[in-house]
A protein has these predicted regions:
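Gly-rich Lys/Arg/Thr-decorated short loops/hinges at beta-loop-alpha junctions or inter-strand turns
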Residues: 62-76
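Short glycine-rich phosphate-binding loop at a beta-alpha junction
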Residues: 98-108
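Two-metal-ion RNase H-like nuclease active-site motif
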Residues: 45-52, 143
Length: 150
């Protein structure tokens, strides 16, 4: 058995993909795929950070119409994972040279992701997580720019 006690400097879980109708389908974007951005056709301007949910957390930084998803962070019940979220957000902001104009978080005031959002010092936009799921599905399958403007 090979073992070492080296400190993990940058966490990176495995990416999980499957195939649907012979096309690759991303289940969890992480090592090798994050922070590769995805683009939208909508003409959005500005910088925003969405801190994600409490369970199976990832976050995303939007810069105009480019969106940079984080690697999988994990469940925020564990304070070590909360610290990893804070460190990864800081690293992304440095890497992308971003200072968000707002941070989006869950409506639930006791979620650790909400606490992290509030501690960042940016204006906070709270979104009910079921509504966030609807927007995500709308973006994936419908015309998101129309849905998001309402």
């Amino acid at each position: 058995m090979l073992s070492h006690n080296r400190k993990i400097r940058i966490r990176a879980d495995d990416t999980v993909m499957d195939f649907y109708r012979n096309e690759p389908y991303m289940i969890r974007r992480s090592r090798g795929y994050a922070p590769l951005p995805f683009m939208t056709k909508a003409d959005w301007k500005g910088q925003v950070l969405a801190v994600g949910g409490e369970l199976k957390n990832t976050f995303c930084i939007g810069v105009d119409n480019r969106f940079y998803p984080s690697p999988y962070v994990g469940d925020l019940e564990d304070l070590r994972t909360v610290k990893a979220l804070q460190e990864t957000i800081h690293r992304f902001q440095t890497l992308l040279e971003v200072k968000p104009q707002a941070v989006v978080c869950d409506l639930h005031p006791k979620y650790n992701s909400t606490v992290v959002a509030e501690e960042l010092g940016y204006p906070v936009i709270r979104v009910q997580h079921h509504y966030a799921h609807i927007l995500s599905v709308s973006y994936t399958h419908l015309r998101a720019h129309e849905t998001l403007r309402h």
